[in-house]
Amino acid sequence: MASAGAGSTGHLDCMLLNAAIGINVTHVPYRGGGPAMQDLIAGRIDYFCTLSATARQQVDGKLIKAIAILSRDRSAMLPELASAREQGLDFEATTWFGFFFPKGTPEPIIQKLHDATVAAMDTPSVQERLKEVGAVTVASERRSPAYLQKFVLSEIEKNAAPIKAAGLAMD
């Protein structure tokens, strides 16, 4: 199994997938997704967890075979590809981004920056660009700083046991 680097999102997602299906494999960390993709195309690695936007061109060119989308639902980037859940695996892994501020940042500043970020994310040009790279924004009820805080804590809880079981640690 290859990833774009130790501790990368792809590494964590593949590791969680491996745990969900009960396999133990050797992790081959690369210095970025490009070299890993090259070795996948060349047949030097067995599989690679990466973003659908990263793999789309190679999938379309039939250079690689996509197996599953790891998010709950199908991706707009690869709509023909079933999710792992649709294929019978009770598993979900997604890449997400949040905006974080230093501890102690005054609430009015957080709210002002939050509101500006949400407004920018909702513009047609940003929505179009996100669509081009296979990304989506979350529903409005999931956009608050309080929701993000709860979500981050739930992600830590969800991932802690598999990370520990795999023996992963920060270097």
Spans of model-derived segments:
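Conserved, function-defining micro-sites of small-solute handling proteins
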Residues: 1-171
